[in-house]
């Protein structure tokens, strides 16, 4: 069986954003390898996998990365539409949600389950991997709002 995954970011910022140095803002028409963040670290793990990189929906709340719960909700809503389209295309047997805050992850898992497609997200996977390495782990983020959001994700994933 061929593994075919779709990597779906939570959002995409306009190419002219002043926040481009730290987040997804590349032109959606570029080849997927050029749009993949941290490609030098990620590509070796995708060698035996057929994969697509969705360009992500343009952020509806502004031209900056998500900062508030409201903005996480907008990102989740936009991404769920892309996830449904990927599931309905019948091309994928895995959906990987990019972005640490994993907006819409629980909803995406529910949606993907209906199509018998595996779905995972960065924070969920990273936190569970961290528990395999030791008894404690830390999440470091520069935003106070994000710190509380990640704490809630830790509780949600029952890792407290």
What is each model feature region?
Residues 102-106, 126-127, 147:
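Short, well-ordered alpha-helical microsegments
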Residues 107-110, 151-152:
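Short amphipathic alpha-helical segments
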Residues 92-99:
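Periplasmic-binding protein-like
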């Amino acid at each position: 069986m061929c593994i075919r995954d779709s990597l779906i970011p939570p959002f995409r910022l306009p190419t002219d954003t002043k926040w481009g140095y730290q987040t997804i803002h590349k032109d959606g028409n570029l080849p997927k390898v050029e749009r993949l963040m941290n490609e030098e670290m990620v590509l070796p793990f995708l060698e035996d996998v057929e994969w697509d990189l969705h360009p992500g929906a343009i952020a509806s709340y502004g031209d900056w990365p998500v900062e508030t719960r409201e903005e996480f909700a907008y990102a989740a809503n936009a991404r769920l539409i892309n996830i449904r389209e990927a599931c309905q295309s019948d091309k994928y047997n895995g959906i990987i949600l990019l972005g640490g805050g994993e907006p819409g992850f629980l909803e995406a898992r529910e949606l993907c389950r209906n199509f018998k497609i595996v779905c995972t997200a960065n924070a969920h996977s990273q936190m569970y991997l961290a528990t395999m390495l030791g008894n404690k782990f830390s999440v470091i983020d520069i935003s106070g709002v994000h710190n509380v959001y990640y704490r809630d994700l830790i509780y949600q994933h029952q890792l407290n």
